[in-house]
Amino acid sequence: MAKIIGIDLGTTNSCVAVMEGSTPKVIENAEGARTTPSIVAFTEDGERLVGQPAKRQSVTNPERTFFAVKRLIGRRYDDPTVEKDKHLVPYSIVRADNGDAWVEADGKKYSPSQISAFVLQKMKETAESFLGEKVEKAVITVPAYFNDAQRQATKDAGRIAGLEVLRIINEPTAAALAYGLDKKSAGTIAVYDLGGGTFDVSVLEIGDGVFEVKSTNGDTFLGGEDFDMRLVTYLADEFKKEQGIDLRNDKLALQRLKEAAEKAKIELSSATQTEINLPFITADATGPKHLTLKLTRAKFEALVDDLIQRTVEPCRLALKDAGLTAGQIDEVVLVGGMTRMPKVQEVVKQFFGKEPHKGVNPDEVVAIGAAVQAGVLQGDVKDVLLLDVTPLSLGIETLGGVFTRLIDRNTTIPTKKSQTFSTAEDGQTAVTIRVFQGEREMAADNKMLGQFDLMGIPPAPRGVPQVEVTFDIDANGIVQVSAKDKGTGKEQQIRIQASGGLNDADIEKMVKDAEAHAAEDKKRRALVEAKNHAEALVHSTEKAVAEHGDKVGAVEKGAIEAALADLKSTLEGDDVEAITAKTNTLAQASLKLGEAMYAAQQPGAEGAAKPADDVVDAEFTEVDDDKKKSA
């Protein structure tokens, strides 16, 4: 049975793990790293780079390098949070035909699901290379506070990458699974997850293999990227004060600032001061300009203090929803790279009144939890039951634009709930069901997930027809809504397709694009391998001709030199078959030279050392020490 893998699709980094028997294992990628940057880039000639290779060239190719795209997934272009990000990233965020936020490079638009799919493909290949078999099924994690549109978009990304997503699991829940798998004692834990782009806090009760989420809260636009951007803004402001040049208008400089900010942030977790040194960051009429600045940990903490404080309110709400006090939490588990920051740990300690647990790897624990859930689905992991919750209330718009809740936040999923509504006007023959997700009292202030019409209601006075609306949330947190006229039995149901989002045709096209890209990547790899093999042969043959060319006849030497010249000129092109054919020709032609070189090394060959006259051929037998003594 093919393995089901667990993938942590992160804002900054992604990670893949698999169960080996009853033990989860994080898989190293082709570069030998256990996490892969969630970065996708396109080179000038259209080659696609994913992970570390994409990150390495980001400074010289900022407009075609996409990072932190998870923050855009399932979001509308006119979302205020997208508006804020547009001016802080060097790549273009554009409006898609359906009103969603997409990204663009060289005139080609990509949906965030598509970019995420390229990262997922890399994780899939990493797992396949380790397992030695095809991988087609996965469990993928999402921030607990993701809404339906964001969950659906993540599932779409999996489909585009050629993966059947068996389960979407919340990141803090996955972390709790990994943390609690080998724990024997029962208890209540809080998972504080501050990652690259999102913040979640979940309260869980663990005991006897049951992981029950009591509540969850968070902010899907708060994470390490915001800390980086705060530092980028500070550096740009300081440079402008000193030099009068705004580096934010220069995409190349902006990318260098971003890289320096990330590096400084990481260094300040262990050091109390760091130096940011960016020579030749820009130039004006007076010549090149350099940015040099000392940054203390205290200054950095002051710059981002409000961001850290923003995590406190979700923690308070999560405890309130769970009906618990901070003192009733047995353990606080830190997840996400940003929890390495001493100030973050200090704030967590102050709020919960206890030292946070640092025994899990914050970068890998979510992928490990996803692998455990994959093991549960596969039947490899027994006696584990996961009870998650829906993060946001779900309901419909009723008369006067009021948001009427059908399912409250933190309801255990899967769940199903029905409620009966009626018409607002006399003789009304159709109703429009508008579905929303959120916590505000007016529907317009919440996130609209979609709408559909129930037609063919028999005309009747207002308030008489009875329309039963049913919400069904599956274990992935994805919503299905149906409406039924009780009088006629007519029913209309939809799996929520956000007013934006990708339809099946879009996804199918993107799947084909991804397959085409995979085919192109294979061709490129074949070309690189053919060229490497050819160049190695050219080098070794030239060396052999220089050292041993006199050992073959003029005809053979001429044939080798002709084949060499032929292969060298073919190497200037990109025809794999031609390069392979010419490589074989050269290999064949240089066989005679190899034979001559080998013959020259043999005893009796010309130039080989002759044995001395007094050397006698003899047979040797082993004699043990006792016989030696008696001899």
Curated annotation (Swiss-Prot):
Keywords: ATP-binding, Chaperone, Nucleotide-binding, Phosphoprotein, Stress response. Residues 614-624 have a biased composition (Acidic residues). Residues 601-631 are annotated as: Disordered. It comes from the Bacteria. SUPFAM superfamilies: Actin-like ATPase domain, Heat shock protein 70kD (HSP70), C-terminal subdomain, Heat shock protein 70kD (HSP70), peptide-binding domain. The modification Phosphothreonine is found at T198. Induction: By stress conditions e.g. heat shock. It holds the Pfam family HSP70. The keyword Chaperone applies. GO terms for molecular function: ATP binding; ATP-dependent protein folding chaperone; unfolded protein binding. Acts as a chaperone. Belongs to the heat shock protein 70 family. This is Chaperone protein DnaK. It comes from Xanthobacter autotrophicus (strain ATCC BAA-1158 / Py2). The lineage of its organism: Bacteria, Pseudomonadati, Pseudomonadota, Alphaproteobacteria, Hyphomicrobiales. The gene is dnaK.
